[in-house]
């Protein structure tokens, strides 16, 4: 009997502009839930298990919402970006939602998507939109969020790494650095941003 070995592949972060373009293309093509899902994942930095618990009332109107993370049980307050909230409203209207307490990510059968199903859909999206990313999965969204926060920090990159460690509930900045694929040279380049 032939034994199969499954290689574990870690997902990659997506370039921020590529992500925004993908979210807009999915919306344009009528794939409102996937557009919203990828947007929520990249703007909120949540694990997929927490994204799938979101209801429309949580993300539609308020400037923040509170969840208890499934994996850790910890309370987390998530701020909703004003620009992204307009996209949430557009998806809500396009889907003709009538119940704000409905989960955001329901299939046609009115069941919440499974992580496995989303990963299958992501493979299809990667092919259809010719995404230049090695491993596109549900982890990609969280890593994209982390990478954007880190890269936007400039000279405060080490501080951003510590903040991300807290947001991601990692035991140390080293774990966060490895999770996001941040190299020592990227951290050291923070010092090159300073002028004298």
Residue ranges and their predicted role:
Residues 50-51, 146, 154-169:
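Active-site-proximal segment of tyrosine recombinases
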Residues 37, 45, 49-54, 164:
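Alpha-helix N-cap/helix-start motif at helix boundaries, enriched for small hydrophobics
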Residues 1-14, 195-196:
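C-terminal secondary-structure termini that scaffold catalytic or DNA-interacting sites
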